[in-house]
Amino acid sequence: MRRTLRFDPGLWYLRATAVGVATMLGTYGWSLYIEHEAGLHVDSVVQAVVISAAFSRVQRAFDRTDRLVACVVLPCAAAGGTELSSLIQHHPDLGDALFILGMAGSVWIRRFGLRATRAGTLLVLPLTAVLVVPGGIAAGGGHERTGWAAVTALFAVVWGTLVTWAAQRTGLVRRPPSAAVVTTAGPARTGIPASTRMALQLAVALAAAFVVGRSQWPDHWAWTVLTAFLVCSGARSRGDVLVKGAWRTLGASVGTMVAGAVAGSFGPRSDTAVVVIFSVLAVATWLRELSYAFWAACVTAVLSLLYDWFGQSSGDLLHTRLAGIAVGAALGLAASWLVLPIRTSAVTRARTATALAALGELLEADWHDARAVRAARGRFIHRVEQLGLATKPLKLLAALPVPHARLMGWQPDRGPLRVLAALRRCTGPVDRLVVAAAAPDVPADDPRVARSRTKTAAHTLALRRAIGRRPAPAQVPSQPTPPTAVSPAGPQTETVRSALLALSEIDAELDVLTGEFGLPPTALPTVPATDSAVPVSVRPSNV
C-alpha cells in the first residue's frame, strides 16, 4: 500500500479510473437495453464493455478534435469488428488474414502523426473484442447487430466525453496536454520507420499465433493470439517487449490460477460474477500504471470469470490457458527481436534528443511571449516523461540480480537512466525560468541572462549533435573585428538572480549528459576558396 501511494500520491490515476468505470457502466447499461429491445445476443454486450473499457483509458489524452474523429472511426470500426467476428467463424482463413491486416494497419498509420496514431488506437478496440468472446458462443442478430454495434460504440464515445468533461470541469481529473505539446516534430530519418517495423513485427507474431493456436487448441486459439497481440502491440523496443512478455506471462498465470480457484463459485449467468468482473476491471485500470503485471493478472482473471459466466469451466481449461499464454508471449517476443528489431538504445537516444530540442526551444523563445514559453516548457516536461517510459525496461533489468551474467562480462546499461535523472533534475530550473519570464521585470533584456541563455542553448545544440553523431559546422577563419562597446549591466534583481541560477543548474546537468554522449564529431575547418590559397599541385589544369 505504501508503494501504491507513492506511485499515485494525488490519487490522480484512481480518479481517472473512477471516470473510466462510469463510462463502462453507462455503456453496459445501454448495451443491455439494446440487447433486450433489439433481440441481440449477449456477445453484443461483451463487445460494448470491452470497447468502453479500452476507450475510457485511451481517451484521457484526447482533445476536441480527437473526440470528433472518434465519433466517426470507432462506430465504423465496431461495425467492421462485428462483421469480422462472423467471418472468422464461417471462413477462418479469410477472417484471420483480415484480422492481421487490420491490426498491422492500425500500427502502420502511426507514421502519419499524432492524429493518425490515435485513430489507429481506436481501430484496435473492436478487433480486440473479437478475441474476448469465448469460443463456441454463436453470434446472433444477423447483419442487424452490425448497425447496433456502431450505435453502441457512438454512445460510448458520447457518454465517455460527457463524463470526462464533467470530471475535468470539476477538477476531478486533469486536463490533457494540447496537441501542440505532445506532437513531436523531428527531421526525416533514413531507413525503415519505426511504425513500419512494429507493424511487420505484429503481423508476423499474429500470423504465427493463429497457425499455432488453431492447430494446437482449435477451440481456444484466441488465448494465444490475444497474448501475442498484447506483447507486440505497444512495444517500444526490444527491452520493452521483453519486460512486457515476462509480465504478461507471470501476471496472466497468476490471474488464471486465482480465477481457477474460484471457478464455479458464482455459476452461469450470475449477477455476482458481473459485479466481480467490473470490480477487477477497475483495479486493473488503476494498477496498470504501477506495473503491467497487475493489469495482465486482473484482465486474465476477468476473462476466466467471463468463461465461467458463459458456463465453460475455467478449471478444466487451466492448463490450456497457461500453455496458450506462454506460447503467445514467446511468439510475440521472437517477432519483436528477430523481425526488424528496434533497439532500446536507439529509442532512448531519439527521445533524449527530442527532449533537448524542447529545452532548446525554451531557451531560444521570446521571453516576452509568455504563451510560447509555457508551451515550450510543456513540451519539455512531456518529452522527459516519454523518455521515462522508454527507460522503464532498463530500470527493471538493472535492478535484477544477475550475478552469473555479470561474471560473463554483461552489465546493464545504466547510461540512459543517468540521462533521465539529469533531465528530470532540469524540470525544477525550467519551472523557475518560466516564472522569471512571466515577471514584470522580464530578465530577457539583461545582458548577463542573454549570455547565459546563449551559452546553455549552444550546449544543448552540441548535445543533440553528439546524439545524432552530426558534426558541428566548420569554423571559417574570419578577419578580426574591432571590439564593440558593451552596455553595462544593471543591478541584479531577484528575478535576474533566479534566472541565472536556473540556467547555471541546467548547464550543470547538461554536463552530465555530455559525459554520457561525448562531444559532437568535429569537421575540418574550411578556408575561403581563393586562387592563391589553392596549392599548385591541385590547381586545375588548362589542358
Please identify what each model-predicted range represents:
Residues 125-129, 428, 432, 505:
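Short, hydrophobic/amphipathic alpha-helical patches that form generic packing surfaces
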Residues 108, 202, 206, 210-215, ...:
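Generic, well-ordered alpha-helical scaffold segments in large soluble proteins
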Residues 1-39, 59, 110-114, 141-153, ...:
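Long, hydrophobic alpha-helical segments that serve as membrane-spanning/inserting helices
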Residues 384, 420-423, 427:
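Long, intrinsically disordered, low-complexity regulatory segments adjacent to structured domains
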Residues 273, 283-299, 305, 458-479:
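C-terminal hydrophobic structural anchor segments
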Residues 274-278, 293-380, 384:
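Generic detector of multi-pass transmembrane helix bundles and their immediately adjacent loops
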Residues 1-282, 286-297, 313-314, 318-321, ...:
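Alpha-helical transmembrane segments and their membrane-interface boundaries
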Residues 76, 250, 254, 294, ...:
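Secondary-structure capping and boundary motifs in well-ordered enzyme cores
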